[in-house]
Amino acid sequence: MNETESQWDKLLKIKTTGRDDSHADQYRYPYEPTPYSVLERLAERYGERKGLWGIEVINEPVTENMWETMKVPERYPAVDPELAEGSGSVTFDFLRGFYKDAYDRIRKYMPEEKYVVIHDGFELKAWKGYMQEEKYKNVVLDTHQYLMVAEANGCEQTMEGYLKYIREHFQKDIQEM
């Protein structure tokens, strides 16, 4: 098991511990799929389909900065504190390795004209220049610019304040990328 695979447990735990969209694991599968095997199976099953635009590796991973900015444990108290124990953010080193490994596994089954989508973990500029090597074809960086992040960063909660924040931060960052 490599470091990326062992750290996946940490990432998976965040998504299933009641932070934002918890659920009870009512169904036990005969095996525990890894995220890589799930991505491979998705790419194998749907990768050649005409209507498929692409596959996103993971939606909204919570990086260290976002974990602190959003005060995740306070904002989203765990439904099951025992299960949530030890959950936390993921590092950029982990995400960078995970995305490259996932890309390779998806590309085994999905042609290059389809897109592999990676999420910025709410830190758009941290990905500047990432996966730009010739090997990586049709990689799309997904970014979600939420005003609640602006609020957490001290944006005045008025129309004027939001518009100013959008111009000075979101618009500027997107243009730079």
Name these PLM-found stretches.
Residues 1-113, 120-126:
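Active-site mouth of glycoside hydrolases
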